[in-house]
Amino acid sequence: MYFKSIQDSIGNTAMIQIPSEASSSIILAKLEGNNPGGSVKDRPALKMIEDAENSGVLKKGGTLIEATSGNTGIALSMVASIKGYKIIIIMPETVSIERIKTMEAYGAKIILVSKEEDMEGARDLAMQMQSNGEGMVLDLSLIHI
């Protein structure tokens, strides 16, 4: 399959038929691991950013803030990079160095909170930073694990 950009490839992963002796139904599986970021989270990350753009909340050159410790942060970092946004990821210090390095490779600024603060502290800091005008929080549920 040919795509003009990484963004265009998100979600356009192959579907394969899974054989089943127990059912006469056709069972299909979508290979979301073949997204450019290697995760099913690539699709919702793109949707979150596009929704913010389409609603007019996210302006060209804006800064995103996200409290996350998982694949959503990696996917958001990738999509933000593709679309030219800055992104600040806030997460507990217990997150693996591999996750941190992956997000940094996409250009994310990483802020670590203590393990005692955990995701609640990350969420609170994200909201405080948004209140201070340092960027916008995409998802009000905030916690992505």
What are these regions (language model features)?
Residues 1-143:
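PLP-dependent amino-acid enzyme catalytic core
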